[in-house]
């Protein structure tokens, strides 16, 4: 059985771990000075840290939308027997809720609430 593992960018796994385990990341939106970026795509953690270290305001994040999740599911559902999505904990973000709503249209998608963030979430992803 061919299974695809998907997580959001907050799982903090290294590029090597992601590649070795064929994990797909969905980047959260990072808001810096009212400007939106995609985590790990159009802004790096180093850029965020440098911004804050220079006295800038803390950045915030926004969950992936239902539509963004649906786009990712559409991309992988045809080629995989199952898709497992492990999200940032539902107590921290709307990622889990949005992924569940998007998954209603994809019977081979299962959404898992990691109940964690950063490396805790990453460990759940690696165990999958």
Each model region followed by its residue ranges:
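N-terminal glycine-rich phosphate/adenylate-binding segment common to multiple enzyme folds
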Residues: 68-96
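Short beta-strand segments
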Residues: 7, 87-89, 112-113
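Active-site histidine-anchored catalytic micro-motif
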Residues: 79, 93-128
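Conserved beta-strand scaffold positions in the cores of enzyme catalytic domains, especially
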Residues: 25, 60, 85, 109-111
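Class I S-adenosyl-L-methionine
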Residues: 19, 74, 100-104
């Amino acid at each position: 059985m061919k299974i695809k593992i998907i997580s959001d960018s907050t799982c903090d796994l290294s590029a090597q771990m992601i590649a070795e385990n064929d994990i797909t990341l969905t980047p959260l939106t990072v808001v810096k000075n009212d400007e939106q970026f995609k985590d790990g795509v159009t802004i790096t953690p180093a850029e965020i840290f440098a911004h804050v270290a220079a006295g800038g305001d803390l950045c915030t994040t926004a969950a992936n939308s239902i539509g963004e999740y649906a786009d990712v599911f559409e991309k992988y559902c045809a080629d995989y027997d199952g898709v497992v999505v492990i999200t940032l904990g539902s107590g921290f973000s709307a990622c889990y809720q949005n992924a569940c709503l998007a998954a209603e249209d994809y019977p081979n998608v299962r959404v898992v609430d990691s109940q964690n963030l950063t490396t805790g979430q990453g460990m759940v992803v690696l165990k999958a």
